[in-house]
Amino acid sequence: MAEPTQPLLTDSNSSSPRSLDDTIESYIGSFGWAQFLQAALVSFSGVFDAQQTFISVFTDSEPTWHCTDSNSICHESISNICILPKTAWSWDYSPHVSVISEWGLQCAGSFVKGLPESSFFVGCLIGGLVLSTLADSSLGRKNMLFLSCLVMAISTMLTVFSPNIWVYAVLRFVNGFGRATIGTCALVLSTELVGKKWRGRVGIMSFFGFMLGFLSLPLMAYMNRGSSWRILYAWTSIPTIIYCVLVRFFVCESPRWLFVRGRREEAISILKRVASIPSTDVSSGGAISMSFSSLPFEEDEEKPSTNVNIFTTMKVLVEKRWALKRLSAVMAIAFGIGLVYYGMPLALSNLDFNIYLSAAFNALMDLPANLITLFLVDKLSRRNALIGFTALGGVSSVLIFALHNMRIGNHGALQLALELISYFSACSAFNMEMIYTIELFPTCVRNSAIAMARQALVLGGVFSPIMVAAGRKNAFWSFGLFGLAIGLLGLFAVGLPETRGSDLCDTMDEEECKDRRSKVAVNNVIA
């Protein structure tokens, strides 16, 4: 799997200095089994991330019911059980199958019913803002991933013992707070362990993990049908705790981050562990130390590395005009994607499909989205692919609204097909956007930039339930706005530079110089 690479010492007299990216790849190779196993283990966190993101679709749903007295006013045409006496109807299953039936919330307001899910997404937003910079500053990628998974696992287990809706909502908030940085850390850590040729493909691995987690939920929920919703939380918490142990003892920290933070000896030790090419220089470590000590940026970064404020990276992103422009664009695009990504599964109830099958179909859409992104990531420009996916998702969503207004017979199958296309487009656009964001920002702020993009995605998830509720009366407020948002906001990619095949930069100055060189090259071509 590894590609032969010449040792760095053979180029020691070269006039053109190597970047940290080239130097690391010269020693460990582009891709090897050690790097693959590391990336696979890190990417598996997406399984537990997805389970906690979508678990409320089943645990917080309103169960089906039936009339118990055929001679009373109760009959099948009545959709609101709150107008019926309690003796006239009964749940089809035990009241413990859902939080709605167990705590008697069937007649509560929409705010109370949606409080746990809203609390989860609010926790994701706050957790992303508070924790995102820690992976770039003090904790690093590995420790942040471990702590995030641990908080999520413990809060999931404690949720099993929730006595009421209020405690349940608080624990869901804590769960979202811990979960907020898992996807970001997994994506950055897995891609920083491999060479640039394989970076796009490895980035897709974390998305496959998320797909498996989403796909496992309908199966687990179906097996748990008729049983307590607490069992579903227990089933998802125990494997997460085991995974935390594996991360703590078997995952390596990013050598790129360690070098940028001035922790050279730790970085060299990790390089020797994950090296995919046989080399006496790698095994000894001496030549590596000499080569990395010659990198000019490391000397600048090493001094302040112990006094970095956790919000320094956010300040740097805002102060640099080019960085702020890029960050604003990727966040706007992510918000549009988030509306569709989280909104479409929630809106399935508006299409009146079986909850287990519809969720499974949506989870399966992640597979073609990941496969297509995997094969196109090295063939199409990041910018054009992102615009294309968002446009396709927008058109499909608007067509659902159009079909709804036509009121033709048997249009449910067409609506479902368009819904799946729209969700598939959102998944593909999300995959491409994350890879694009990795390449748009240097190492010193990369984790924070991706975290902000994911925050915008989650913000779309906060608004989507409100739009879905409004769409039950008028489909424009759900499917219509979903389509317009993702389609129009996707056009922000027009102003971003193309990054396919380019080297990853490590400092803001290095990225700025590369941007200036590309602009000069474009001007020369035009002239």
Swiss-Prot record:
ATP binds at S190, T191, E192, L193, V194, G195, K196, K197. InterPro entries: MFS_dom (IPR020846), MFS_sugar_transport-like (IPR005828), MFS_trans_sf (IPR036259). GO terms for molecular function: ATP binding; transmembrane transporter activity. The gene is OCT2. One of its GO terms (cellular component) is plant-type vacuole membrane. It is found in: Vacuole membrane. One of its GO terms (biological process) is monoatomic ion transport. It comes from Arabidopsis thaliana (Mouse-ear cress). PANTHER family: SOLUTE CARRIER FAMILY 22 MEMBER (PTHR24064). This is Organic cation/carnitine transporter 2. Belongs to the major facilitator (TC 2.A.1) superfamily. Organic cation transporter (TC 2.A.1.19) family. It comes from the Eukaryota. High affinity carnitine transporter involved in the active cellular uptake of carnitine. Also transports organic cations. Weakly expressed in roots, including tips and initiation site of lateral roots, siliques and flowers, especially in pollen and stigma. Residues 1-27, 141-149, 196-201, 252-326, 378-385, 437-448, 497-527 are cytoplasmic. It is a multi-pass membrane protein.
